Amino acid sequence: MSGSGRIPLWVVATIAGLGIITVLGIFFYGAYAGLGSSI
């Protein structure tokens, strides 16, 4: 992991960021959907 990999760091960061945003989005959507259906 000395920066000599074939995958650029910005590609890894972008994919990781999108994955985190997607997980957070699904989590918050599920929380709000569950909260709305329980009321």
Swiss-Prot record:
Q: What does the UniProt entry say about where the protein is found?
A: Cellular thylakoid membrane
Gene3D superfamilies attached to this UniProt entry: 6.10.250.2070
Task: List the Pfam families.
Answer: PsbJ (PF01788)
Q: Give UniProt keywords alphabetically.
A: Membrane, Photosynthesis, Photosystem II, Reaction center, Thylakoid, Transmembrane, Transmembrane helix
Could you tell me which cysteines form disulfide bridges?
none
Topologically, how does it sit relative to the membrane? Single-pass membrane protein
Under InterPro entries, the record lists: PSII_PsbJ (IPR002682), PSII_PsbJ_sf (IPR037267)
Q: Where are the transmembrane segments?
A: 7-27
GO cellular component terms, A-Z: photosystem II reaction center; plasma membrane-derived thylakoid membrane
What GO terms describe the biological role, i.e. biological process, of this protein? photosynthesis
Does the keyword Cell membrane belong to this entry? no
Q: Highest taxon of the source?
A: Bacteria
Quaternary arrangement and interactors, per the entry? PSII is composed of 1 copy each of membrane proteins PsbA, PsbB, PsbC, PsbD, PsbE, PsbF, PsbH, PsbI, PsbJ, PsbK, PsbL, PsbM, PsbT, PsbX, PsbY, PsbZ, Psb30/Ycf12, peripheral proteins PsbO, CyanoQ (PsbQ), PsbU, PsbV and a large number of cofactors. It forms dimeric complexes.
| Annotated PANTHER family | PHOTOSYSTEM II REACTION CENTER PROTEIN J (PTHR34812:SF3)
HAMAP family from the UniProt entry = PSII_PsbJ
Q: Which family does it belong to?
A: Belongs to the PsbJ family.
Describe its function: One of the components of the core complex of photosystem II (PSII). PSII is a light-driven water:plastoquinone oxidoreductase that uses light energy to abstract electrons from H(2)O, generating O(2) and a proton gradient subsequently used for ATP formation. It consists of a core antenna complex that captures photons, and an electron transfer chain that converts photonic excitation into a charge separation.
Protein name from the UniProt record: Photosystem II reaction center protein J
In the record, what lineage is assigned to the organism producing the protein? Bacteria, Bacillati, Cyanobacteriota, Cyanophyceae, Nostocales
Primary gene name: psbJ
